[in-house]
């Protein structure tokens, strides 16, 4: 996470797009480059409020973020071990999440996120993903991840849900 009064200013230096107009509960996709203009990584930036953001990427960039943050009034924290993420992609993903009582999930706009309750657990769901199809990413406490996985797969007999790892997702990445 990136927090502090310079959080937005720091992220604007870090990535190749301007996030001055980002609103809470919005997500942006971005690239970040080093000082020589070479691509370091890509990922998503989640805005919780004016001074609180989450950066999600496939590679570990913590040291580079910390080095880049010198001179900014920000706190950078690696929250990788305190949050779990499940990508749930495909044309039936909205329907299945709705059947799990993620009420109004169908109203969640692309590149936005909100809080939903599934199995009496509060989770964050973003309408993001890189499969090119309708999809969501579900964010929860690590202790909730197994139950969330089981809830999703409880529909396997009717909807033929398939588990796929990051390598498989990278193959369909657009």
What role is predicted for each listed range?
Residues 1-174:
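Basic, glycine/lysine-rich polyanion-binding surfaces/domains
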């Amino acid at each position: 996470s990136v927090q502090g009064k310079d959080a937005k200013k720091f992220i604007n230096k870090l990535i190749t797009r301007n996030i001055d107009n980002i609103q809470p509960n919005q997500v942006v996709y971005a690239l970040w480059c080093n000082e020589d203009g070479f691509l370091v990584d890509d990922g998503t930036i989640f805005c919780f409020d004016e001074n609180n953001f989450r950066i999600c990427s496939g590679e570990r960039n913590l040291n580079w973020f910390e080095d880049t943050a010198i001179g900014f009034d920000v706190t950078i924290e690696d929250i990788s071990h305190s949050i779990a993420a499940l990508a749930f992609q495909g044309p039936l993903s909205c329907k299945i999440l709705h059947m799990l009582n993620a009420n109004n999930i169908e109203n969640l706009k692309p590149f936005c996120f909100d809080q939903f309750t599934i199995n009496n657990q509060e989770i964050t769901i973003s309408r993001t993903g890189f499969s090119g199809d309708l999809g969501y990413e579900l964010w929860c406490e690590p202790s909730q991840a197994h139950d969330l996985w089981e809830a999703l797969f409880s529909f396997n007999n009717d909807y033929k849900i398939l588990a796929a790892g990051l390598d498989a997702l990278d193959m369909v990445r657009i």
